[in-house]
Amino acid sequence: MNQINIEIAYAFPERYYLKSFQVDEGITVQTAITQSGILSQFPEIDLSTNKIGIFSRPIKLTDVLKEGDRIEIYRPLLADPKEIRRKRAAEQAAAKDKEKGA
């Protein structure tokens, strides 16, 4: 069977993990992730909850890989972006009110 070259990436705030390797043509994303050994290196990765993509495009674990694909395993968000925006807007409004009152 023919081999294809792929990469797998997992990023942290201060560093990232990137591994290049060859897999059999026709392999699924999930099989490649398992074969890469990344799940034993980073036990916090849970394929049922972590989102997965190829070059920032969301994909399914059952998708078949192509030559040159880079599988990206995304960490869960630490905070809800909508909640952060709401909090920031409230803080800015409070600061403006304080300036007006001063």
From Swiss-Prot:
NCBIfam families: PRK01777.1. Disulfide bonds: none annotated. This is Protein RnfH. It comes from Haemophilus influenzae (strain 86-028NP). Belongs to the UPF0125 (RnfH) family. The lineage of its organism: Bacteria, Pseudomonadati, Pseudomonadota, Gammaproteobacteria, Pasteurellales. InterPro entries: Mopterin_synth/thiamin_S_b, RnfH, RnfH_sf. PANTHER family: UPF0125 PROTEIN RATB (PTHR37483:SF1).
